[in-house]
């Protein structure tokens, strides 16, 4: 059953990643690897930074084990109060952070980018103001999707990427002539709205209702925040690397930061299709096995997951490294995407490919530590 679910999620993720490549192809064809795309990718890294930090990363992995234990200890009705408190706290926090991003967009970009060209900086500044509230919608989506996965409603949660990519693709094509790169920013924001909206029907099937409760004294809320601290430190360490990479890239000739992004999309394809699909399906099974103290199931699931991952990732790594230039040419070289952009992007992709197996394995191993409430090793890694 676990690997049947994994296969379904992999198929959906494969479709999502293919659409992701189509999205990048369209962005590359319409805008190329230029100062304008550097501004767009730099602006969207800021809400993405906070989203990974508080939404997709720490909250999802901390929230589900506590939720499952709460149901075992006190029943679903009591544990639902915990869910409502978490979601309402997210709304308050992310709304505040999004407003701060808008108010202090210039100061943030001066820290995270190295734009010397005033035009690129001003474009990034306006784009950051447009996409800031993406953080609110996608952080909520991160918790809601974790809840759906826990109830084995994998297909809807896995389809978030499809909605994201379709929104960007359609938005770019519809708005490119009237709004240029700013149309891309608007499509990016709308994708967050649509991802959350898509999951709400199944969320209400599980929860039945919604309560605007803030219970900061809830024992499960307190425990969640305590467990989040080391997780946040670990994720922050990784995310800050991306911000630093982008800062250095924006100090180089126009288009360098965009080439870095285009290469990372190809590198993230096998991670998204294989590593994340397996991790998403395995995590609820591990969490429930730990609650019932079934260590035999935990060992079996982790071992099977690692073997399956290696079988899928090693060939992917070899292909990406050996055929980097051909792949980049096939996918990106059209419209405004030049031969110079192909060379920079393919060389970057080869370096990414070397670390593919190791980075993919982290997705599985960190979750196996999280279910035991072990945050130390993931933070160190």
Residue ranges and their predicted role:
Residues 1-381:
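Membrane-embedded alpha-helical bundles of multi-pass transporters/translocases
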């Amino acid at each position: 059953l676990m690997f049947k679910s994994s296969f379904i999620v992999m198929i959906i993720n494969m479709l999502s990643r293919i659409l992701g490549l189509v999205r990048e192809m369209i962005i590359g064809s319409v805008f190329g690897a230029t100062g304008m795309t550097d501004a767009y990718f730099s602006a969207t890294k800021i809400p993405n930074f906070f989203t990974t930090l508080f939404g997709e990363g720490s909250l999802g992995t901390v929230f589900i084990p506590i939720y499952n234990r709460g149901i075992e200890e006190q029943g679903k009705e009591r544990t639902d109060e915990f869910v409502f408190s978490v979601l309402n706290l997210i709304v308050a926090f992310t709304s505040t952070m999004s407003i701060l991003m808008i108010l202090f967009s210039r100061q943030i970009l001066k820290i995270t980018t190295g734009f010397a060209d005033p035009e690129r900086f001003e474009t990034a500044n306006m784009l950051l103001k447009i996409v800031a509230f993406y953080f609110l919608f996608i952080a909520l989506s991160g918790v809601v999707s974790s809840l759906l996965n826990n109830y084995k409603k994998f297909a809807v949660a896995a389809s978030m990427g499809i909605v994201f990519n379709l929104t960007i693709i359609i938005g770019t094509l519809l708005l490119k002539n009237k709004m240029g790169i700013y149309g891309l920013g608007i499509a990016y924001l709308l994708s967050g709205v649509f991802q959350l909206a898509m999951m709400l029907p199944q969320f209400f099937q599980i929860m039945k209702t919604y309560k605007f409760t803030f219970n900061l004294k809830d024992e499960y809320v307190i425990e969640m925040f305590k467990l989040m601290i080391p997780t946040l430190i670990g994720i922050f360490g990784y995310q800050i690397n991306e911000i630093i990479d982008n800062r250095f890239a924006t100090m180089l000739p126009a288009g360098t930061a965009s080439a870095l992004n285009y290469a990372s999309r190809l590198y993230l394809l096998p991670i998204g299709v294989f590593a994340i699909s397996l991790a998403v399906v395995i995590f609820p099974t591990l969490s429930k096995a730990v609650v019932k103290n079934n260590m035999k199931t935990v060992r079996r699931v982790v071992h099977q997951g690692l073997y399956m991952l290696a079988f899928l990732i090693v060939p992917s790594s070899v292909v990406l490294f050996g055929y980097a230039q051909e792949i980049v040419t096939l996918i990106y070289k059209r419209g405004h995407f030049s031969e110079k952009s192909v060379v920079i992007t393919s060389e970057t992709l080869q370096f990414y490919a070397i670390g593919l197996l190791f980075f993919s394995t982290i997705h599985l191993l960190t979750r196996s530590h999280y279910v035991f409430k072990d945050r130390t090793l993931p933070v160190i890694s």
